């Protein structure tokens, strides 16, 4: 019997494809109007190319609702961003004979529009229909004209143009080239600098191919106009940041319809990792939010013009926004993606000297609060993501903490010398309050990584520095019945009751500083204030690494609850503001998760919807959407750790992580469902099956030559130092299977029979037992067994 049960455990599976089509719940219109600023065009998960309309008023994501006119369709966009624009490169505009450019733009009025996952179409007033879908690095167009049509191509177009040279956050044209290669091909490039991160020039190369021959009406270095004899034209636009040759190679053979099907299948695969059940409205909110999380950053592996190291991701907009909610979500449900993102940050460090806090157009910047690559690394390590050089990561983190950068807006830490000398950043240095509090959290993350690497001296140093938030905690300041706040202090250690209002060269009025004061008039941005995008009332509740210490500083649990209640009642909570993401969950720390639930549920109901204005603030690369996802799941991650705050939710929720599974089988004529999951805890893989726990060392995971034989039927059993794998084969055996088509386990040779995109099918020489082993996963898990001589066949489900 024991061996019968143990054979069962070899068959643990990752997610089996669900029958339900989750793509039907994605509505790209959600969050596109108002503050959300999400991208509405077609996109692949983490796709580099995002084709869509650019309206003449140039919103950040290109699109604006009707009746705003369309300047054309460009191939590159961001999603959910505030501040200045970025991208909007290589414009295509279909038109009819007789239409003319006006001030360099051939704007068209829409009379109809369709927005769906992976598909965009619009009908112009002149009855030209444009349909768009995309691959990861190639845009697909199907244009239907009411008569033989024209196409305008403009390599000089981009979003965020400004008449003032070198205006902050505006993009500026550096150069272009357009070349007619053949009667069906146009190639060229556009080089643009600036934008939101004030970055160096980036160059977008394109290779455009049509399925119908064209004649050339006009061509120069910036633009061309083409004429078609046909009324329907299919166009593919390959994009590269390296060369036209690479852009050409990025064009797949698929037709428009085939590519749309491929795109939707890929989204189904990604969305199905989380299974949420609720009302149709909530399903749309949930899966659209999950879709938004996977729009940025973008996978540009092989498309970095500066170095060849891979992987490479770009468009971190910004880690200051995403580290709290998006980073843990990817680490839990998409660990292979998050592993690549962390390694990309380390490749940037190796080649440019610092990990970015933000990056776009292959250029670091702009750093907003802290150096939050530290949080991303600590979060990955806490969640057991392997394949990352954590020694190198610690080196990069320490450089952030010790070496002042040449340009602190681009990378690293501003005010670092003062922070390391005084233990805080004094008033007068921009964002001094934000930086002090967030550097303390970053230092705590450094300490956690150092501890896991066994570097106690480094751990002690940065744990000490993680308490620096207390150096701006003014214990005697009382406001609205609350005592103690993060407040401004000068370099001599004096607390400032009043601060200058603005930066006028001739007039410096002083105003009293209070916890609800924004220390700048309307004409100055958040970059120059004591807190970035927040108030003291908000940041005085934002110490995620030391909430118990914060509660003590506030006067204990009762005073802390009163502070939270007052904070919400007085309207200081800003749902759209990342420093407040954790705040409604803080009731957990005083033993009242029910109050956290009440707050979060109310916030979701009052501020989010499935309508175009359904996001209350900038989505910021999925930060706002991932906050919504966690709220709907009834749990919240503590970034930099593997811990969650949890409460029950009314809607039935099933979370589908790659490492949370359900083993389904028949034993003794009874149908069984046994939960199976695994989590890394340092170098120990903790496997849970039924009520048993198996602690397996990393060396065993990597090199074992057989399965473990401990029973999972023993109630609450804990097996330490397990010598074999449990529910999966070792990485060495999997490597042998890939290289040789066979592996040996427990003295039995298993040979490859066939494979699919998800599994490798193997059969044992000894008794023809069959297994299906998962491909491309964190662990090579056995997903299915058949023809078991013990008479037990089973499948694994999620």
Which residues fall in each region the model found?
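Acidic, serine/threonine-rich low-complexity disordered tracts
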Residues: 651-798
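Generic detector of low-complexity/intrinsically disordered segments
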Residues: 7-13, 210, 219, 228, ...
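Active-site and channel-lining beta-strand-loop segments
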Residues: 488-489, 773
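Accessory carbohydrate-recognition regions in carbohydrate-active enzymes
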Residues: 20-375, 381-437, 445-471, 477-483, ...
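Bacterial Sec-dependent N-terminal signal peptides
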Residues: 1-20
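ATP-dependent phospho-/nucleotidyl transfer catalytic cores
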Residues: 442
């Amino acid at each position: 019997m024991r061996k019968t049960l143990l054979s069962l455990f070899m068959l643990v599976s990752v997610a089996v494809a669900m029958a339900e089509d989750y793509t039907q719940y994605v509505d790209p219109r959600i969050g596109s109007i108002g503050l959300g600023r999400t991208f509405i065009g077609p996109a692949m998960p983490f796709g580099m190319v995002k084709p869509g309309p650019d309206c003449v008023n140039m919103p950040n994501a290109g699109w604006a609702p009707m009746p705003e006119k369309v300047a054309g369709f460009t191939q590159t966009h961001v999603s959910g961003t505030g501040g200045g624009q970025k991208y909007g490169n290589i414009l295509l505009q279909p038109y009819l004979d007789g239409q003319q450019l006006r001030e360099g733009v051939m704007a068209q009025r829409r009379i109809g529009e369709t927005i769906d996952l992976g598909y965009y179409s619009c009908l112009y007033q002149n009855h030209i229909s444009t349909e768009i879908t995309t691959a990861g690095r190639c845009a697909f167009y199907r244009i239907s004209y009411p008569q033989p049509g024209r196409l305008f191509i403009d390599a000089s177009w981009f979003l965020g143009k400004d008449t003032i040279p070198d205006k902050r956050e505006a993009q500026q044209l550096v150069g272009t080239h357009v070349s007619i290669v053949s009667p069906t091909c146009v190639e060229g490039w556009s080089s643009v600098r600036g934008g939101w991160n004030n970055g160096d020039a980036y160059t977008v190369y394109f290779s455009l191919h049509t399925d119908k021959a064209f004649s050339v009406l006009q061509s120069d270095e910036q633009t061309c106009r083409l004429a078609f004899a046909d009324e329907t034209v299919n166009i593919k636009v390959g994009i590269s940041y390296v060369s036209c040759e690479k852009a050409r190679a990025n064009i797949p053979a698929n037709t428009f319809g085939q590519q749309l099907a491929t795109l939707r299948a890929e989204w189904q695969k990604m969305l199905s990792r989380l299974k949420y059940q609720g009302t149709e409205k909530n399903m749309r909110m949930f899966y659209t939010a999950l879709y938004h999380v996977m729009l940025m950053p973008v996978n540009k592996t092989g498309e970095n013009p500066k170095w060849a190291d891979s992987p490479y991701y770009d468009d971190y907009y910004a880690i200051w926004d995403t580290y709290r909610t998006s980073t843990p979500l990817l680490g839990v449900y998409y660990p292979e993606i998050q592993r690549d993102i962390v390694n990309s940050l380390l490749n940037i460090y190796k080649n440019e000297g610092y990990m970015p806090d933000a990056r776009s157009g292959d250029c670091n910047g702009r750093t907003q609060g802290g150096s939050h690559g530290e949080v991303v690394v600590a979060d990955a390590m806490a969640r057991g993501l392997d394949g990352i050089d954590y020694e190198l990561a610690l080196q990069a983190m320490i450089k952030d903490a010790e070496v002042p950068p040449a340009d602190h807006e681009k990378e690293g830490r501003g005010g670092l010398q003062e922070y390391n000398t005084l233990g805080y950043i004094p008033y007068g240095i921009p964002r001094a309050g934000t930086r002090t509090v967030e550097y303390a959290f970053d230092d705590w993350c450094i300490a956690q990584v150092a501890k896991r690497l066994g570097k106690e001296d480094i751990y002690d140093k940065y744990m000490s520095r993680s308490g620096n938030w207390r150096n701006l905690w003014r214990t005697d300041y009382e406001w609205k019945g609350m005592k103690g706040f993060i407040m401004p202090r000068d370099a001599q250690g004096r607390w400032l009751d009043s601060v200058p209002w603005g930066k006028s060269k001739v007039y410096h009025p002083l105003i009293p500083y209070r916890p609800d004061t924004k220390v700048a008039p309307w004409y100055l941005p958040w970059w120059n204030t004591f807190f970035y995008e927040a108030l003291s009332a908000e940041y005085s509740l934002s110490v995620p690494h030391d909430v118990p210490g914060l509660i003590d500083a506030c006067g204990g649990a009762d005073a802390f609850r009163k502070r939270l209640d007052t904070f919400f009642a007085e309207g200081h909570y800003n749902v759209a503001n990342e420093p407040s993401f954790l705040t409604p969950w803080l009731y957990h720390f005083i033993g009242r998760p029910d109050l956290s639930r009440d707050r979060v549920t109310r916030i979701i109901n009052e501020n989010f919807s499935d309508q175009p204005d359904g996001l209350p603030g900038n989505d910021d690369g999925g930060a706002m959407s991932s906050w919504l996802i966690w709220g709907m799941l009834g749990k919240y991650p503590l970034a930099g750790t593997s811990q969650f705050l949890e409460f029950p939710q009314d809607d039935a929720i099933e979370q589908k992580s790659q490492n949370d599974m359900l083993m389904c089988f028949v034993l003794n004529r009874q149908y069984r469902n046994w939960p199976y999951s695994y989590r890394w805890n340092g170098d120990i893989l903790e496997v849970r099956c039924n009520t048993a726990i198996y602690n397996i060392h990393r060396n065993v995971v990597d090199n074992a030559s057989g399965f473990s034989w401990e029973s999972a039927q023993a109630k609450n059993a804990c097996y330490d130092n397990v010598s074999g794998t449990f529910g999966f084969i070792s990485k060495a055996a999997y490597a042998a299977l890939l290289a040789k088509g066979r592996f040996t386990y427990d003295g039995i040779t298993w040979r490859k029979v066939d494979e699919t995109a998800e599994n490798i099918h193997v059969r044992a020489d000894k008794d023809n037992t069959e297994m299906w082993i998962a491909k491309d996963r964190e662990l090579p898990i056995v997903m299915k067994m058949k023809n078991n001589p013990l008479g037990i066949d089973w499948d694994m489900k999620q």
